[in-house]
Regions:
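Enzymes that bind and transform nitrogen-containing heteroaromatic metabolites
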Residues: 1-131
């Protein structure tokens, strides 16, 4: 399983049940790198990918059905993802929901900088499971 998330500098994901930020460049990059696979998302994330309906499957239990999952509002500590892709906003936003993945089980495999539409720089990090 591959998990894709967006984080601020403190590992925040949400504030008051709302996403911290968004950038269309992230969605474009996610879809561009699907390599023919479907992206599984929750109804919460559907608005982000409405332009990519042929590439996306929306369902409540997407974490148990999908191989590639974009996650915004789920606890991830029990997921045994082989790969975690993080898009970092490179700033701090208010947050009350944080990423709970134990990254001691992962190693940074790749890192790239993206020029965002609403963010000057977005850092993409790809982590592979080592344990």
């Amino acid at each position: 399983m591959k998990i894709i998330i967006c984080l601020d500098d403190n590992g925040g994901m949400l504030f008051n049940n709302r996403r911290q930020s968004r950038d269309r460049v992230v969605c474009e990059d996610v879809v561009k790198n699907l390599n023919g696979e479907k992206l599984f998302i929750s109804p919460f994330s559907q608005i982000l990918f409405e332009s990519y309906e042929n590439d996306v499957l929306v369902c409540e239990d997407f974490l148990t059905k999908g191989r590639v999952c974009f996650v915004e509002n789920q606890v991830l500590s029990s997921c045994n993802a082989d790969e975690v892709i993080i898009y970092r906003w490179n700033r701090v936003y208010p947050a009350d929901f944080y990423c709970d993945i134990d990254f001691s089980k992962y190693s940074l495999a790749e890192q790239a900088e993206l020029e965002g539409f609403s963010h000057e720089k977005i850092t993409k990090e790809i982590y592979k499971r080592v344990v």
